[in-house]
Amino acid sequence: MKKVLFLLFLIGTIFTVSISASVNIPLNDGWLFNRGFQASSSGMTKVNLPHTWNAEDGMFGNTDYYRGLCNYTRKLQLPIQYQGKRIFLKVGAAQTVADVFVDHHFVTQHKGGYTAFVAELTDFIKPGKESTLEIRVNNAPTMDIAPICGDFNIFGGLYRGVELIVTDDVCIAPDYYASSGVFFTQTEVTKEKATLKIETLLSSKATSLGG
C-alpha cells in the first residue's frame, strides 16, 4: 500500500509541475472565415470553433460538396507579462492540410485531418503587440494523405479546438506530436507489485522538438 501511495504521489507531482509551468489560452471564438486563396476583410464571416464549411453541402451523402482552400484569421495580443515566455499554438484537428501564418509569415504546415499538431510561435509573436494569426485549411483531394477514398465525406475545417500554450523556457515539451510529453510504460506486473517506467520529455528553446 505504501508503494502504491508513493507512486500516486509521484504521478500527481509530475502533473502538478506540468500544469503550473504552462498557461492554456483558448482561441475558439472570434475567427473570420472565407473561401478562396486570399484572406481579405471583405466577404469574411464570423465563426467560432469547432467549425466546418461543409455543414450544409456535405450532409446526407451529397458528393458535390466544396473541397478546396479556406482561410481562418483572428487577432492575437498577449499580455506584456508573457514577454520572455515561449508561445505554442495547438490545433486539435484541421482537415486535411493546414498552413499556419503569423502576420503573413509562414510558420508550419501540417498534413492529416485526424491528428492534433503544435507549432511554436515564440519567434513570431511579441507580447503586448497585436498580431494576426491565419490558418489556411485545404480539404481538396490528394493522393498522398489518407483517406484517399471512402464511403464518407471529408468535412473541411478547424473541427476541434485551438489554443495557445504559454510556458517557461524549459518546459515539458508540448510540441512532440502534440502529446502531453509524459509517457508511462508498464514494465512488470506480478501479484506482488507493478512497475511503471515514467518518461518526461523536456524542451528548451535551444533543443525544441517538432512534430
Please state what every model-predicted region is.
Residues N34-G36, R67-D175, S179-G181, K205:
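Accessory beta-strand-rich segments of carbohydrate-active enzymes
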Residues M1-V4:
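Positively charged n-region of N-terminal signal peptides that target proteins for export
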